[in-house]
Amino acid sequence: MGYYDIDDILADGTRFPCRFNYDVPGLGYLEGNPGRPISKNAKLELPLWMVHLLAVVGAQSNEDSRVEEPLPFVELLPPDLFAPRVLNAIKSGATSLDLHSISPHFYTLAEKWATLFSDKELSQVLKDMLLERGQEINNHAISVSMFSNCNQTNDSAVFLQTLDEFEKTIYRDTNVNCKEMKKWLVLK
């Protein structure tokens, strides 16, 4: 993804739940209380770009000076996006899942989450899901480009609406490449 990739920017704006580990003066406006502090253990939903920074940067705690590594400002809480029920649904049948309704930027967010927490299980689930859904995306892209005179079937249209933005890019690229291959074969 590039520096100005709109999908990456939109994914970074997705709100994730977090819990503050410190009392922070002057940030009450994040809770809707301007001029007041955010209290310790306050739970908020903040954009991913902000939560990521606050989860990495730590502050020195006055409570326990023996701790060598500073506690980060916030602790990221697992979002509903990666809840066990969602992961189980992916494992049981990734092609039947409406990924767009879960999040339009599911793959981007999952990649960032797995990288941030070194989550090997999530990475494996994503890999398996991409392989399974990728085959289905390829089948739909090829069938549309091969039979461009025919109308799309209802199943194909429904499946295409369940794709997230990354999968839509894969679909478009596959479709264009199939059309180019078809042209090349005709010329040969």
Swiss-Prot record:
Domain of life per record: Eukaryota
Gene: PSF3
Function: The GINS complex plays an essential role in the initiation of DNA replication.
One Gene Ontology term from the biological process aspect of the record: mitotic DNA replication initiation
Primary location group: nucleus
Family, per entry: Belongs to the GINS3/PSF3 family.
CDD domains found in the cross-reference section: GINS_A_psf3 (cd11713), GINS_B_Psf3 (cd21693)
Species annotation: Kluyveromyces lactis (strain ATCC 8585 / CBS 2359 / DSM 70799 / NBRC 1267 / NRRL Y-1140 / WM37) (Yeast)
Entry GO terms, CC: GINS complex
Protein name: DNA replication complex GINS protein PSF3
Cysteine-cysteine disulfides: none
Entry's localization field: Nucleus
Summary of subunit composition and partner proteins: Component of the GINS complex which is a heterotetramer of SLD5, PSF1, PSF2 and PSF3.
Assigned keywords, A-Z: DNA replication, Nucleus
